[in-house]
Amino acid sequence: MDPRGILKAFPKRQKIHADASSKVLAKIPRREEGEEAEEWLSSLRAHVVRTGIGRARAELFEKQIVQHGGQLCPAQGPGVTHIVVDEGMDYERALRLLRLPQLPPGAQLVKSAWLSLCLQERRLVDVAGFSIFIPSRYLDHPQPSKAEQDASIPPGTHEALLQTALSPPPPPTRPVSPPQKAKEAPNTQAQPISDDEASDGEETQVSAADLEALISGHYPTSLEGDCEPSPAPAVLDKWVCAQPSSQKATNHNLHITEKLEVLAKAYSVQGDKWRALGYAKAINALKSFHKPVTSYQEACSIPGIGKRMAEKIIEILESGHLRKLDHISESVPVLELFSNIWGAGTKTAQMWYQQGFRSLEDIRSQASLTTQQAIGLKHYSDFLERMPREEATEIEQTVQKAAQAFNSGLLCVACGSYRRGKATCGDVDVLITHPDGRSHRGIFSRLLDSLRQEGFLTDDLVSQEENGQQQKYLGVCRLPGPGRRHRRLDIIVVPYSEFACALLYFTGSAHFNRSMRALAKTKGMSLSEHALSTAVVRNTHGCKVGPGRVLPTPTEKDVFRLLGLPYREPAERDW
């Protein structure tokens, strides 16, 4: 979506004036006027165990239970019907956390995915496939074997369960999306460069974002304590990374998705990540659907679209409009304007709005800015304007010429959308290495000094970011000549042993990269911009507890081969 999409969507909308004294950012209404909560959970008496689920997500579950007629009660309380625990929880650990010798009579121990599915379907669903296995020593009679249990689960139940994992997970202490372009940094030393984003190369857990990487929503999981690599998914062609992006489906529902994208962007700039994710899931599902949606029932049948979303789809079909668009807070276009400043994330944009700022001129004259934000504001228009491919080529050649003046054997490759063959680029990422594995050392500082002396580098955003053996520079460049714009440039120097994985990482789209990492994880492997490792040990929450063994990957083709994937040319990684 165009970075200024919301501003374009509402150029003449009359503003709704909020109480000027309010310091709380207005939120999009949770439900339409006159809409009443349904009590379809009235028979539920639940206790939510927060361990593993996380406080924020547990509180969301509890709020939804009460809102829809259910009751919250202690685990040992009379009449408790369901005890909800984290996906990776086993029976004995649950009892220890609850400080109970055994489950209360009539209580069922269920995974949080069951409650997510109930909330998604707006009904109490069967717990088959969601119950925590109870060891036979805790039973008065033998429990059916796992094979018997699996045989009793209707086909498709596991897939439905895995789809529900897109419900809000506990907010992580750091983002679980792949490392993004720098957004905020208090100084030019290496550190998290956004108040909303940070990275160490590989996500610590496969999250809702990873699940978006699967077209079908299919996501194999492993049992606790299973350190053996999981088998590859039965149908690899359901993974984004297994398909060429040239085969993207035609969007038969553009008239619907373009309106939902405005809402998704509005939620995103307001910091409502989970609701934005829900809309993104529905938008992706609609874009992949093989025909135009024509009815409520048809919308409900699409995986990833619930009843409430289906109602919005039908409203658009019947009226050509979505009433929620009329209720978008007046803060949203301003927040989008502010968050487009390089160095300012969602939190900073909200802070500025709460301080009374409403324009870039307000920010320029009144806000306290970091060095990076001041640079981002100075080049605001240039950074938002995508550069033609020819300009990106000139930038790559300028860096290459300067590097090879020190050593003619250095390899310099522009990655990102440029390497994927796009006609325009937002910025340029240049990878530098040397085949001998040694001569790249010491080139980083000398190259930057040379480019500064030429006047090619005009501003430093992050002068040096150490990432293992990789060194990364984030800055601003401008080609010589009248009318040239300032452009974002990243220069990354990597050892040759990591070059293939770095090339793969900095070339693929965010969606493609998430899919590759998620697939690697299902195989007991780990993929980052540094290496592909096997025999990686993870705990029940998906966090690595053993680094595994690094596999040799001389070329990108080796990475695809080791993951059991057909090789995809850079132009086919543009999901």
Swiss-Prot record:
Annotated region described as DNA-binding, given as residue ranges: 265-279, 345-348, 466-505
GO CC field: nucleoplasm; nucleus; site of double-strand break
Chain intervals with Acidic residues compositional bias: 194-203
Example GO biological process: DNA replication
Gene3D superfamilies linked to this entry: 5' to 3' exonuclease, C-terminal subdomain (1.10.150.20), Beta Polymerase, domain 2 (3.30.460.10), BRCT domain (3.40.50.10190), DNA polymerase beta, N-terminal domain-like (1.10.150.110), DNA polymerase, thumb domain (3.30.210.10)
E.C. code: 2.7.7.7, 4.2.99.-
Residues the record lists as binding Mn(2+): 427, 429, 490
Subcellular location: Nucleus; Chromosome
Pro residues bias locations: 167-178
GO molecular function, one term: DNA-directed DNA polymerase activity
Location of region: Disordered: 161-205
Mutation effect (residue 312 to A): Reduces dRP lyase activity by over 90%
UniProt KW keywords: Chromosome, DNA damage, DNA repair, DNA replication, DNA synthesis, DNA-binding, DNA-directed DNA polymerase, Lyase, Manganese, Metal-binding, Nucleotidyltransferase, Nucleus, Transferase
Active site: 312
BRCT domain location: 36-132
Region listing for Involved in primer binding, in residue ranges: 420-429
Cofactor(s) recorded in Swiss-Prot or TrEMBL: Mn(2+)
Function: DNA polymerase that functions in several pathways of DNA repair. Involved in base excision repair (BER) responsible for repair of lesions that give rise to abasic (AP) sites in DNA. Also contributes to DNA double-strand break repair by non-homologous end joining and homologous recombination. Has both template-dependent and template-independent (terminal transferase) DNA polymerase activities. Also has a 5'-deoxyribose-5-phosphate lyase (dRP lyase) activity.
The protein's assembly and partners: Interacts with PCNA. Interacts with PAXX; promoting POLL recruitment to double-strand breaks (DSBs) and stimulation of the end-filling activity of POLL. Interacts with XRCC4; promoting POLL recruitment to double-strand breaks (DSBs) and stimulation of the end-filling activity of POLL. Interacts with NHEJ1/XLF; promoting POLL recruitment to double-strand breaks (DSBs) and stimulation of the end-filling activity of POLL.
Recorded family membership: Belongs to the DNA polymerase type-X family.
Protein name: DNA polymerase lambda
